């Protein structure tokens, strides 16, 4: 399984759209993206990149494999 690298929030959103997610939409304290009935809460904008640990958790929740994620790399 490939090792992830940190990504910017903008890159995360663009790459999630490749997997069929729409959004981000405003909701509560965090924005979210949707794919069908699945809702994925995404981190708020901040200065740094999204850590490898958080990215791994988001991908697991979105049911996206590490191999598929790496294929969308620019």
Q: PLM features: what roles do these ranges have?
A:
Residues 1-74:
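Basic nucleic-acid-binding interfaces
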């Amino acid at each position: 399984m490939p090792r992830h690298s940190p990504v910017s929030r903008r890159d995360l959103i663009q790459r999630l759209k490749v997997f069929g997610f729409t959004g981000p939409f405003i909701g509560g304290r965090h924005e979210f993206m949707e794919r069908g009935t699945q809702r994925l809460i995404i981190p708020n904008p901040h200065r740094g990149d999204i850590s490898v640990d958080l990215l791994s958790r988001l991908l697991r929740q979105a049911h996206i494999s590490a191999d598929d994620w790496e294929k969308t790399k620019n």
